[in-house]
Amino acid sequence: MTRGLAPLLPIEFHKMGSFRRPRPRFMSSPLLSELPRFQAARQALQLSSNSAWNSVQTAVINVFKGGGLQSNELYALNESIRRLLKSELGSFITDYFQNQLLAKGLSFVEEKIKQCEGDNRIEVLAEVWDHFFTETLPTLQAIFYPVQGQELTIRQISLLGFRDLVLLKVKLGDLLLLSQSKLPSSVIQMLLILQSVHEPTGPSEGYLQLEELVKQVVSPFLGLSGDRSCSRPTHSLARRHSRVRPKVTVLNYASLMTTVGRPLNEMVLTPLTEQEGEAYLEKCGSVRRHTVANAHSDIQLLAMATMMHSGLGEESGSEDKHLLLPPTFPPPHRQCSSEPSILDSPDEMELEDVASGSQEDSELNCASLS
């Protein structure tokens, strides 16, 4: 038996060895040999990113100093930012702009304002704001056009920076109390525009300080705490005509009940959501940037207001006019005036016809001008 098995063993091992694959070599050896080439390519990419970012920094600081962009420079800056967005620095561009570039650029603006005192400082502030709002801000938006902010856009970040780093540091409130001259319209525009920018985390200390400034120059003023009064003479935006107009009192029971039943948070105007950047445009196409939703409109109130204003232009008497509007209760499911009215059954259609008929009768009987 031993003699019979002995010659079979070499044959069996020979068959197994024929199907065995050769042992693979150390796989990292080719990569180690190409490592210098990869390092050289990475260094070249970093140098390119640094060069692109340096060009962006130089252009932004030059804009804050009052300079402009050269021919075709905007296209080159946009391409540089697109390359940076694809690199490791892409997620830090917005933060670096807010914390470094914007702070450094606005420091030049603050120094220019603080060189003057008294009423001259207010005049310089108005000039600085005009240049910032008409020249600097649009240029910054154009340079950082490819950037899509996470919560705030480049425009909002720039306006918030101007509020915190320029306006609140020049102590405009003290200047307004001491100033006897007429306040420039650019300062009022600046305060109202800055008030329209809101932080995503809610009202900050800077926003509340800004509201105190707005309260000193605008009357009537409606802020987070409601209507406020001020002892200092204020500038009313609606006071444009010096001629005497008759007083008109509008009594609308539906609006009164709606106002009383609505909480304070819903009565305060909420800001529009502003989006910009290439990513947003690719997502939404040609959709408008600002959208006003749930805008309630009353056709009857609009018609009566038109008649009221047309009567004011013809009559110059000082007698009081009282306008009584009938109560209108819109259905709870109607959110917009353009929303179609869909009824489920003929009975509801009959009820609506009866309600509209009674409403027309009440309009003819209750609406009167005395």
UniProtKB/Swiss-Prot annotation:
Ranges where the record places region Disordered: 327-370
GO molecular function: ubiquitin protein ligase binding
Entry comment on modification after translation: Ubiquitinated. Ubiquitination by RFFL promotes proteasomal degradation of PRR5L thereby modifying the substrate-specific activity of the mTORC2 complex. Ubiquitination by RFFL is stimulated by LPA/lysophosphatidic acid.
GO terms (BP aspect): cellular response to oxidative stress; negative regulation of protein phosphorylation; negative regulation of signal transduction; phosphatidylinositol 3-kinase/protein kinase B signal transduction; positive regulation of intracellular protein transport; positive regulation of mRNA catabolic process; positive regulation of phosphatidylinositol 3-kinase/protein kinase B signal transduction; regulation of fibroblast migration
A single cellular component GO annotation: TORC2 complex
Keywords: Phosphoprotein, Signal transduction inhibitor, Ubl conjugation
Residue positions where Phosphoserine is found in the record: 28
Family of the protein in this entry: Belongs to the PROTOR family.
Function of the molecule: Associates with the mTORC2 complex that regulates cellular processes including survival and organization of the cytoskeleton. Regulates the activity of the mTORC2 complex in a substrate-specific manner preventing for instance the specific phosphorylation of PKCs and thereby controlling cell migration. Plays a role in the stimulation of ZFP36-mediated mRNA decay of several ZFP36-associated mRNAs, such as TNF-alpha and GM-CSF, in response to stress. Required for ZFP36 localization to cytoplasmic stress granule (SG) and P-body (PB) in response to stress.
PANTHER family given in the database record: PROLINE-RICH PROTEIN 5-LIKE, TARGET OF RAPAMYCIN COMPLEX 2 SUBUNIT BIT61-RELATED
Quaternary structure annotation from Swiss-Prot or TrEMBL: Interacts with the mammalian target of rapamycin complex 2 (mTORC2) which contains MTOR, MLST8, PRR5, RICTOR, MAPKAP1 and DEPTOR. Interacts with RFFL. Interacts (via C-terminus) with ZFP36 (via C-terminus); this interaction may accelerate ZFP36-mediated mRNA decay during stress. Interacts with RICTOR.
Name of the featured protein: Proline-rich protein 5-like
Organism: Rattus norvegicus
